[in-house]
């Protein structure tokens, strides 16, 4: 019995540990969100555009999340000409397909407001005159990171994710969106 125990202990202790501290999952990269009433959707099976360009949806396959302990939603945006503050939302449509989106329940992951002066207006001379003296410069972009670890049970399999900005400008915004999963550990 002791020899069996020692053999099992030896086999288990010689197995390899795999520790991956994080995994970043890019959803949208340099995605344009703008208003264009005449927009003809050039939808693919993966990305769909709705609301005259103000909503984009993408079907993604999320990684297995059983071994992750934390998840974050990350959004980075900059203006490509829209001069106003706008509300926005990053959301998930679990267990949905494009044919039943109207009936699908959305799950908001991150709500945000686009800040004035980010990106497009950094080097505009007229805007610099309007900038408050206590702000040394406009930022190049803005990033939000939100802990969504409590949603790990639904962050799996094939889902639709969406991004909405309430813009009425045909210049709009450029957005990067992703997930970051932390603390992955397995013993092989």
Regions found by a protein language model. Name each.
Residues 1-7:
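Sec-dependent signal peptide recognition
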Residues 8-9, 144:
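Intrinsic low-complexity, intrinsically disordered segments enriched in polar/basic residues
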Residues 16-188:
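Extracellular/secretory-pathway and virion-surface proteins
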């Amino acid at each position: 019995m002791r020899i069996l125990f020692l053999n099992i202990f030896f086999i288990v202790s010689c197995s390899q540990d795999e520790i991956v501290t994080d995994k970043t999952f890019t959803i949208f990269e340099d995605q344009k969100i703008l208003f264009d009433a005449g927009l003809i959707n050039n939808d693919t099976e993966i990305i769909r555009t709705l609301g005259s360009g103000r909503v984009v949806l993408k079907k993604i396959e999320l990684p297995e999340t059983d071994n992750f302990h934390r998840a974050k939603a990350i959004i980075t945006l900059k203006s490509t000409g829209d001069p106003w503050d706008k509300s926005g939302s990053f959301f998930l449509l679990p267990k949905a397909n494009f044919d039943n989106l109207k009936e699908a329940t959305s799950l908001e992951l991150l709500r945000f407001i686009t800040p004035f002066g980010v990106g497009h207006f950094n080097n505009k001379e007229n805007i610099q005159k309007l900038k408050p003296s206590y702000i040394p410069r406009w930022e190049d972009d803005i990033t939000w990171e939100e802990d969504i670890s409590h949603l790990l049970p639904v962050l799996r399999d094939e889902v639709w994710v969406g991004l909405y900005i309430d813009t009425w400008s045909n210049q709009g915004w450029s957005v990067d969106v992703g997930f970051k999963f932390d603390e992955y550990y397995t013993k092989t």
